[in-house]
Amino acid sequence: MVNAADLLAAAVRDGRLERSSGVSPHEHPLAARSYLSDGTGLAWHVPSALRSHGTFVLDAEIPRPVRSTLVRRYGVDDPDTFAERWTRAEALAKLADLPIITWLSRHGLTVPEHVGALRDVGETDWSTERFGDVIVTFAVTAHAQRADTSEERSPAVGGTV
Protein backbone atom coordinates (compact mmCIF):
# COMPACT_ATOMS: atom_id res chain seq x y z
CA MET A 1 0.00 0.00 0.00
CA VAL A 2 1.19 3.49 -0.81
CA ASN A 3 1.60 5.86 2.13
CA ALA A 4 -1.04 8.63 2.08
CA ALA A 5 1.37 11.26 3.43
CA ASP A 6 3.87 10.54 0.63
CA LEU A 7 1.11 10.54 -1.98
CA LEU A 8 -0.20 13.88 -0.77
CA ALA A 9 3.26 15.46 -0.65
CA ALA A 10 4.00 14.32 -4.22
CA ALA A 11 0.60 15.44 -5.52
CA VAL A 12 0.89 18.91 -3.97
CA ARG A 13 4.51 19.26 -5.09
CA ASP A 14 4.10 17.90 -8.64
CA GLY A 15 0.46 18.73 -9.31
CA ARG A 16 -0.87 21.94 -10.76
CA LEU A 17 -3.43 24.19 -9.08
CA GLU A 18 -5.39 26.33 -11.51
CA ARG A 19 -7.81 29.13 -10.65
CA SER A 20 -10.25 30.15 -13.34
CA SER A 21 -13.86 31.05 -14.01
CA GLY A 22 -14.46 27.63 -15.56
CA VAL A 23 -13.68 24.55 -13.49
CA SER A 24 -16.52 22.30 -14.57
CA PRO A 25 -16.10 18.54 -15.00
CA HIS A 26 -16.32 19.14 -18.75
CA GLU A 27 -13.39 21.57 -18.69
CA HIS A 28 -11.29 19.62 -16.16
CA PRO A 29 -12.52 16.01 -16.22
CA LEU A 30 -9.64 14.48 -14.24
CA ALA A 31 -9.04 17.35 -11.82
CA ALA A 32 -10.30 17.65 -8.27
CA ARG A 33 -12.33 20.86 -8.18
CA SER A 34 -13.73 23.41 -5.75
CA TYR A 35 -15.88 26.46 -6.41
CA LEU A 36 -15.24 29.82 -4.73
CA SER A 37 -17.58 32.56 -3.55
CA ASP A 38 -16.22 35.04 -6.12
CA GLY A 39 -17.46 32.93 -9.05
CA THR A 40 -14.10 31.36 -9.83
CA GLY A 41 -12.89 27.93 -8.85
CA LEU A 42 -9.80 25.81 -8.37
CA ALA A 43 -8.83 22.73 -10.34
CA TRP A 44 -6.11 20.51 -8.87
CA HIS A 45 -4.42 18.51 -11.60
CA VAL A 46 -2.82 15.55 -9.84
CA PRO A 47 -0.16 13.81 -11.94
CA SER A 48 -1.59 10.74 -13.70
CA ALA A 49 1.12 8.51 -12.21
CA LEU A 50 -0.32 9.24 -8.75
CA ARG A 51 -4.06 9.09 -9.50
CA SER A 52 -4.23 5.29 -9.57
CA HIS A 53 -2.82 5.14 -6.02
CA GLY A 54 -5.40 7.31 -4.27
CA THR A 55 -8.54 9.38 -4.29
CA PHE A 56 -7.66 13.08 -4.32
CA VAL A 57 -9.99 15.91 -3.32
CA LEU A 58 -9.71 19.55 -2.37
CA ASP A 59 -11.89 22.23 -0.91
CA ALA A 60 -11.21 25.95 -0.99
CA GLU A 61 -12.68 29.08 0.52
CA ILE A 62 -11.98 32.78 0.40
CA PRO A 63 -12.01 33.79 4.08
CA ARG A 64 -14.96 36.04 4.92
CA PRO A 65 -16.30 37.36 8.23
CA VAL A 66 -17.87 34.46 10.11
CA ARG A 67 -21.62 34.70 10.65
CA SER A 68 -22.66 34.94 14.29
CA THR A 69 -24.67 31.70 14.09
CA LEU A 70 -21.54 29.83 12.98
CA VAL A 71 -19.44 31.49 15.69
CA ARG A 72 -21.95 30.30 18.30
CA ARG A 73 -22.10 26.79 16.86
CA TYR A 74 -18.37 26.20 16.26
CA GLY A 75 -16.68 28.74 18.56
CA VAL A 76 -14.47 30.22 15.84
CA ASP A 77 -14.69 33.89 14.86
CA ASP A 78 -11.38 34.38 13.01
CA PRO A 79 -12.09 34.16 9.24
CA ASP A 80 -8.82 32.40 8.39
CA THR A 81 -9.15 29.83 11.18
CA PHE A 82 -12.77 29.17 10.26
CA ALA A 83 -11.89 28.74 6.56
CA GLU A 84 -9.06 26.33 7.46
CA ARG A 85 -11.37 24.18 9.58
CA TRP A 86 -14.25 24.39 7.12
CA THR A 87 -12.18 23.36 4.08
CA ARG A 88 -10.66 20.49 6.06
CA ALA A 89 -14.15 19.27 7.06
CA GLU A 90 -15.40 19.61 3.47
CA ALA A 91 -12.42 17.71 2.02
CA LEU A 92 -12.68 14.90 4.57
CA ALA A 93 -16.45 14.68 4.03
CA LYS A 94 -15.79 14.24 0.30
CA LEU A 95 -13.37 11.41 1.00
CA ALA A 96 -15.84 9.81 3.42
CA ASP A 97 -18.57 10.10 0.78
CA LEU A 98 -20.74 12.12 3.17
CA PRO A 99 -22.71 15.30 2.52
CA ILE A 100 -21.11 18.15 4.48
CA ILE A 101 -24.28 18.57 6.57
CA THR A 102 -23.95 14.95 7.74
CA TRP A 103 -20.26 15.44 8.52
CA LEU A 104 -21.03 18.57 10.53
CA SER A 105 -23.80 16.88 12.50
CA ARG A 106 -21.45 14.00 13.38
CA HIS A 107 -18.11 15.76 13.82
CA GLY A 108 -18.53 19.53 13.60
CA LEU A 109 -15.34 21.12 12.36
CA THR A 110 -13.11 18.61 14.15
CA VAL A 111 -11.22 15.67 12.69
CA PRO A 112 -12.23 12.31 14.18
CA GLU A 113 -9.36 10.39 15.74
CA HIS A 114 -9.62 7.58 13.19
CA VAL A 115 -10.61 9.53 10.09
CA GLY A 116 -9.37 6.77 7.77
CA ALA A 117 -11.89 4.41 9.33
CA LEU A 118 -14.89 6.52 8.34
CA ARG A 119 -15.41 4.09 5.50
CA ASP A 120 -13.32 1.31 4.08
CA VAL A 121 -11.10 3.58 2.00
CA GLY A 122 -7.61 3.27 3.40
CA GLU A 123 -5.11 5.64 4.94
CA THR A 124 -5.99 9.35 4.73
CA ASP A 125 -3.89 12.51 4.90
CA TRP A 126 -4.55 16.21 4.31
CA SER A 127 -2.81 19.56 4.17
CA THR A 128 -4.28 23.04 4.50
CA GLU A 129 -2.44 25.91 2.84
CA ARG A 130 -2.98 29.50 1.77
CA PHE A 131 -2.68 30.55 -1.88
CA GLY A 132 -3.10 34.32 -2.13
CA ASP A 133 -6.62 35.10 -0.89
CA VAL A 134 -7.70 31.44 -0.82
CA ILE A 135 -7.43 28.77 1.89
CA VAL A 136 -7.15 25.28 0.36
CA THR A 137 -7.25 21.84 1.93
CA PHE A 138 -5.80 19.06 -0.19
CA ALA A 139 -6.68 15.52 0.91
CA VAL A 140 -6.04 11.98 -0.23
CA THR A 141 -7.03 8.48 0.70
CA ALA A 142 -4.52 5.88 -0.44
CA HIS A 143 -5.98 2.86 -2.21
CA ALA A 144 -5.16 -0.36 -0.43
CA GLN A 145 -5.00 -2.25 -3.70
CA ARG A 146 -6.39 -1.70 -7.12
CA ALA A 147 -7.01 -4.81 -9.16
CA ASP A 148 -8.38 -3.14 -12.31
CA THR A 149 -6.37 -0.21 -13.61
CA SER A 150 -7.99 -0.14 -17.04
CA GLU A 151 -10.42 2.68 -16.20
CA GLU A 152 -9.40 6.21 -15.29
CA ARG A 153 -10.91 7.50 -12.03
CA SER A 154 -12.43 10.93 -11.90
CA PRO A 155 -11.80 12.59 -8.51
CA ALA A 156 -14.61 13.88 -6.37
CA VAL A 157 -15.86 17.43 -6.44
CA GLY A 158 -18.97 17.38 -4.33
CA GLY A 159 -19.89 14.90 -1.65
CA THR A 160 -19.17 11.83 -3.75
CA VAL A 161 -15.86 10.10 -4.24
Stretches with model-predicted labels:
Residues 1-161:
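Core catalytic alpha/beta fold that binds nucleotide/phospho-ligands
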